[in-house]
A protein has these predicted regions:
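Hydrophobic, aromatic-enriched alpha-helical segments typical of multi-pass transmembrane helices
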Residues: 20-237
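Short, intrinsically disordered terminal tails adjacent to the first/last structured region
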Residues: 1-24
């Protein structure tokens, strides 16, 4: 009798455990909430960046958002640097968390997992940016550029590469509408990047660059918007 009762009890407990065991691919409620919290970080990251480039020029009387780059806002000796550096670091941390959220949302979509990994890499590399600032234009024109300027350029190129790759893999991860949107985003990034790059020699020579800041901000803006759209799409995914 004891053996019979013991076996029955074991079957009951086993059935109870099976009833609470998540189905393969199913996310626990607590895990789902954590994932959504990480995805919201993507939206917050874009808002932080926009707020930074909107507020920082107020600390620099002669700064022009149309003709000067974002990098100049945290250049060596820039009056806005003390504000921009912590905000940019916050932005990068939020992007890393968003990348983890994208990774956790990938399921069996390998392309989306790659997007998450690229966004994490983008954020990690971005954390180094404020520690390798450029010099102000006047210093560069006087030949006072150093290794930090070179490193800043390398970091920027790596970030752009991660950005383009993330959008490219993202285009393959979701539906047709998001794919077309991602392709349009890449095209805008390429055009904006070329226009910004053409003015780079003039920046170093401290010559007028009347539209350089605008082209760069359009470039940055389309990526920030893409991040928000991706976050919203994943937040609404089952």
């Amino acid at each position: 009798m004891d053996k019979t009762n013991s076996a029955a009890t074991e079957r009951t407990m086993s059935a109870h455990r099976e009833g609470h065991r998540p189905v393969h691919g199913q996310i626990r409620p607590s895990g789902r909430m954590a994932r959504k919290g990480l995805l919201v970080c993507g939206i917050l990251s874009s808002l932080i960046y926009v707020a930074t480039v909107a507020l920082a020029p107020m600390l620099w009387e002669n700064y022009s958002s149309t003709s000067q780059t974002v990098s100049e806002l945290f250049a060596i000796g820039a009056p806005s640097r003390p504000l921009v550096v912590p905000l940019m670091l916050t932005y990068d941390v939020l992007v890393i968390e968003f990348g983890l959220g994208v990774w956790g949302s990938a399921g069996r979509k390998r392309a989306l997992r790659v997007v998450g990994g690229l966004l994490v890499a983008y954020g990690v590399v971005g954390l180094a940016g404020p520690f390798f600032p450029i010099h102000l234009r006047e210093a560069l024109a006087a030949g006072e550029g150093t290794l930090t300027d070179t490193m800043h350029g390398i970091i920027t190129m790596v970030l752009v590469l991660f950005m383009l790759l993330a959008i490219g893999f993202g285009a393959a991860a979701l539906g047709k509408r998001f794919r077309l949107y991602s392709i349009a985003t890449i095209l805008m990034l390429v055009v904006g990047g070329v226009l910004t790059g053409l003015d780079q020699p003039r920046l170093v020579a401290n010559l007028p660059t009347p539209w350089m800041g605008l082209w760069e901000r359009i470039n940055i803006g389309v990526f920030l918007l893409w991040v928000v759209v991706l976050a919203i799409a994943l937040l609404h995914a089952p």
